[in-house]
Amino acid sequence: SLDFDFLEYEPEQSTKEGALKIQMSNTQLTSMCKHFASIPQPRKLIFIADADDTSTNKELGSESGFKVWGNNVYSFTIPVPAHRTDTPKICIEHYYSDNDIKTQVEINGVQRRIYMGNEFDSVGISVDGQLCCVDRNSCGPDKIRIIDGTSDKRVFCIQGDRKTNLALPKMEFADRVLGNSPEYSNIDFSSFSLIFDIINKICDQ
């Protein structure tokens, strides 16, 4: 069986008290790999990145499945599950099915959920013409980017209160999945075995 710990942290802008807060961009993740690999590490450190950025895929990934930096430091980008082979530039939320990602939850009387770029046209208007996404760069029929309600990725109802954000933050989604929220009671985690397979291979090194 695998024996490892995950570093749990929140984004810097998180309001959760007592949590470790880190701004973990792709660039910073790569820098951390280089830094930790420069000195011997007493235990294996594994850095895992989304697969939605070409330069990061090259820096942190490898055709063998993971990159060996030396001094017990390893990295890999998340492998692409079978249901995402047509759109391989993915982040961790894409491990879930589209239906699971789009599950609605009620927060303070507002129905919120994660949206995907292909639900909107290239100017940010939803297919049914009811909603608007302010992040046009994430929108379009060929895009599956996660639209999660952060300040620059708000979704609002065109005919309603434009101040009400309908998109669900990634961390709220993750907390509810982890907390066995009833809305996500039947969520499918099977794709995550791909990640644990790579961790297992690294642990066996």
Q: For each predicted feature, which ranges?
A:
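Nucleic-acid enzyme cleavage-core boundary/entry regions
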Residues: 143-205
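Generic alpha-helical secondary structure signal
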Residues: 27, 90, 99, 190-193
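Intrinsic-disorder/low-complexity coil detector
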Residues: 10, 78-80, 140, 168, ...
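Conserved helicase/translocase motor-coupling segment
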Residues: 1-63
